[in-house]
Amino acid sequence: MNEVAIVKEGWLHKRGEYIKTWRPRYFLLKSDGTFIGYKERPQDVDQLETPLNNFSVAKCQLMKTERPKPNTFIIRCLQWTTVIERTFHVDSPEEREEWIQVIQHVADNLKKQEEEMMEVRSGDSPSDNSGAEEMEVSHSKPKHKVTMNEFEYLKLLGKGTFGKVILVKEKATGRYYAMKILKKEVIVAKDEVAHTLTENRVLQNSRHPFLTALKYSFQTHDRLCFVMEYANGGELFFHLSRERIFSEDRARFYGAEIVSALDYLHSEKNVVYRDLKLENLMLDKDGHIKITDFGLCKEGIKDGATMKTFCGTPEYLAPEVLEDNDYGRAVDWWGLGVVMYEMMCGRLPFYNQDHEKLFELILMEEIRFPRTLLPEAKSLLSGLLKKDPKQRLGGGPDDAKEIMQHKFFAGIVWQDVYEKKLVPPFKPQVTSETDTRYFDEEFTAQMITITPPDQDDNFEFVDNERRPHFPQFSYSASGNA
């Protein structure tokens, strides 16, 4: 294995993802794609401290812009099915060009290495990376090409800069799915292939009872489509709004299933979910948790006259995200703390309509609890809502195991959680997977065609020449969803 070396280092101005100020950071780019940033220039590169910013340039796309500042460049990549961006600026066009060339060079090398490894691994199977990838994830090739015409389009569930999410009904089965549609032009630069779709593989390979499964993925001439499970037991948000508060036992049940899913993502997939909030938690027909990936919020943050335009709910943002420091796996445990606080206390731990004041509360305010909360629950929530991710419960090297061993979860057999042996505390009153009683009547009563599929959108009418950037993108889960 090649030794990891520092390829380039130097000062960059990084723009905050949420509080959109520019902060100077000293960045090191390594040959393995690691791109890490520090407040001060590190004294000893052989004994680096924990960085403030830590991400990878593998499979990234690079863009140049002169807004909001001259000599700006953006690193864009697909995380799961969500497009994330990091924005930097430097002092001169030459300096920007230098960074872009080096980052692109590292990304290209990594892609080449991955392709070589896939060739070795695939043996007799097709030698191109994407073909081998499909061989790995799909036990049987789709019997027919999936197209947009096979669904009824019922309701817009979410909309963002890069696409939209629609509640759809598969005509053949009557089953409901969430279809996430991303515009190709934002993932593929003008003449440049984006090294994306790793997350397509993450989704295809993800097999966990409490995570939303990917049923199909396919493409049209201008879009990538992910068709994902849509659990019909209703949003947890809906049930909590109706009951105002859950018992500690009920919160423990949901919390355990969420921990099990996040543990799987962190340890098996090396994915930080980043977006845990009540609206992203649904119940299946039996009352088990399904964590969704329908969000377009991180994509919907606009640049505008005000530097603080948000999509979605900033109430869930962890302190390290607001401060634009490194957010590793511990960011998910903060999210768990917020949703479990809501379940047991009936309100958000920090809230103010004014975003500036809200950010101040998240960063500075001590957490308060209702008197009725038992000590074990207080201890768990205090641990999960620690401001410093290193001090946070789950913030150590043992990650989820720290939370699993907390006294609040004493008595929980974690293998039983995974195997769905625990009886859900609430069973949605649905009779089948096509029962829509927990769906908003506004969209179950009538069919709305969001985007009438035309012939151009039909997968079968699009030949490979017109979609060279995304070979072998189509996928169909074998067996039932």
Curated annotation (Swiss-Prot):
Phosphotyrosine: modified positions: Y475
Tissue/organ expression: Expressed in the oocyte.
GO cellular component, alphabetical, reads: cytoplasm; nucleus
The record ties this protein, via PROSITE patterns, to: AGC_KINASE_CTER, PH_DOMAIN, PROTEIN_KINASE_ATP, PROTEIN_KINASE_DOM, PROTEIN_KINASE_ST
Q: Which reaction does it catalyse?
A: L-seryl-[protein] + ATP = O-phospho-L-seryl-[protein] + ADP + H(+); L-threonyl-[protein] + ATP = O-phospho-L-threonyl-[protein] + ADP + H(+)
Q: Does the keyword Phosphoprotein apply?
A: yes
Domain (Protein kinase): residue spans on this chain: 151-409
Could you name the domain of life of the organism this protein comes from? Eukaryota
Main EC class the enzyme belongs to: transferase
Family listed: Belongs to the protein kinase superfamily. AGC Ser/Thr protein kinase family. RAC subfamily.
Q: What does this protein do?
A: AKT1 is one of several closely related serine/threonine-protein kinases known as the AKT kinase, and which regulate many processes including metabolism, proliferation, cell survival, growth and angiogenesis. This is mediated through serine and/or threonine phosphorylation of a range of downstream substrates. Over 100 substrate candidates have been reported so far, but for most of them, no isoform specificity has been reported.
What does UniProt say about this protein's domains?
Answer: Binding of the PH domain to phosphatidylinositol 3,4,5-trisphosphate (PI(3,4,5)P3) following phosphatidylinositol 3-kinase alpha (PIK3CA) activity results in its targeting to the plasma membrane.
Which protein are we looking at? RAC-alpha serine/threonine-protein kinase
Q: Which gene encodes it?
A: akt1
